[in-house]
Amino acid sequence: MPMLAFALSFYFSLSTAFYFHVGEREEKCIIEDIPSDTLVTGTFKTQQWDFRRQDFLESAPGLGMFVTVTTYNDEVLLSKLYGPQGRFYFTSHSPGEHIICLESNSTRLVSFGGSKLRIHLEIRVGQHDLDAAIAQAKDKVNEVSFKLEHLIEQIEQIVKEQNYQRDREENFRMISEDTNSNVLWWAFAQTLIFIAIGIFQMKSLKNFFIAKKLV
């Protein structure tokens, strides 16, 4: 994988915005000299070349951008896949040069027409602004909210399954009680029938004996 690197000099606490062209799946890296314990904010937007219009589109739908940040000691500070546009943050742990690399994750073959992507990039070094803090807080809140919603859905599903099992057990209990009640009444009815038959047979037998003058 080719790696095209170019060094840019930035003043501390300044924001620099620029754009560059790359081919799909081509990696472009920026070298930053950053003091220690410094927040760095990067904002990027990807535009895709349209052959029919012979111009860049406003966005690159379906395309992702893989952002990695490393030091010259090979310490990885950031490695994350974003969409066609996004914002990333990292904090330097030690002073020195840091390498910020961007690479699209397109699976299509690079066309013969040259660079087909335009990447707008803005780097802010040493700006602990409120927007960055709010964005980081929102990311954490969104992550927690997503996990909480997923947990609530699981709890609701468990409650539904418990209610379903409870209903089944209640129906089974009612059916069992009805069956037992029917069996009991049928046994009682059979007993009455047997008693009635016995009384009838005894009376018939007595009448027979009387008729035959045996008693």
Curated annotation (Swiss-Prot):
<feature type="short sequence motif" description="COPII vesicle coat-binding">
    <location>
        <begin position="208"/>
        <end position="209"/>
    </location>
</feature>
<dbReference type="GO" id="GO:0005794">
    <property type="term" value="C:Golgi apparatus"/>
</dbReference>
<keyword id="KW-0256">Endoplasmic reticulum</keyword>
<dbReference type="InterPro" id="IPR015720">
    <property type="entry name" value="Emp24-like"/>
</dbReference>
<feature type="topological domain" description="Cytoplasmic">
    <location>
        <begin position="186"/>
        <end position="215"/>
    </location>
</feature>
<keyword id="KW-0175">Coiled coil</keyword>
<dbReference type="GO" id="GO:0030134">
    <property type="term" value="C:COPII-coated ER to Golgi transport vesicle"/>
</dbReference>
<dbReference type="GO" id="GO:0005783">
    <property type="term" value="C:endoplasmic reticulum"/>
</dbReference>
<keyword id="KW-1133">Transmembrane helix</keyword>
<dbReference type="GO" id="GO:0005793">
    <property type="term" value="C:endoplasmic reticulum-Golgi intermediate compartment"/>
</dbReference>
<dbReference type="GO" id="GO:0007030">
    <property type="term" value="P:Golgi organization"/>
</dbReference>
<keyword id="KW-0732">Signal</keyword>
<feature type="signal peptide">
    <location>
        <begin position="1"/>
        <end position="17"/>
    </location>
</feature>
<dbReference type="GO" id="GO:0005789">
    <property type="term" value="C:endoplasmic reticulum membrane"/>
</dbReference>
<protein>
    <recommendedName>
        <fullName>Transmembrane emp24 domain-containing protein 11</fullName>
    </recommendedName>
</protein>
<keyword id="KW-0812">Transmembrane</keyword>
<feature type="domain" description="GOLD">
    <location>
        <begin position="27"/>
        <end position="125"/>
    </location>
</feature>
<feature type="transmembrane region" description="Helical">
    <location>
        <begin position="168"/>
        <end position="185"/>
    </location>
</feature>
<dbReference type="GO" id="GO:0006888">
    <property type="term" value="P:endoplasmic reticulum to Golgi vesicle-mediated transport"/>
</dbReference>
<dbReference type="InterPro" id="IPR009038">
    <property type="entry name" value="GOLD_dom"/>
</dbReference>
<comment type="function">
    <text>Part of a complex whose function is to bind Ca(2+) to the ER membrane and thereby regulate the retention of ER resident proteins.</text>
</comment>
<feature type="glycosylation site" description="N-linked (GlcNAc...) asparagine">
    <location>
        <position position="105"/>
    </location>
</feature>
<dbReference type="GO" id="GO:0006886">
    <property type="term" value="P:intracellular protein transport"/>
</dbReference>
<feature type="topological domain" description="Lumenal">
    <location>
        <begin position="18"/>
        <end position="167"/>
    </location>
</feature>
<feature type="short sequence motif" description="COPI vesicle coat-binding">
    <location>
        <begin position="208"/>
        <end position="215"/>
    </location>
</feature>
<keyword id="KW-0472">Membrane</keyword>
<feature type="coiled-coil region">
    <location>
        <begin position="129"/>
        <end position="171"/>
    </location>
</feature>
<dbReference type="Pfam" id="PF01105">
    <property type="entry name" value="EMP24_GP25L"/>
</dbReference>
<comment type="similarity">
    <text>Belongs to the EMP24/GP25L family.</text>
</comment>
<keyword id="KW-0325">Glycoprotein</keyword>
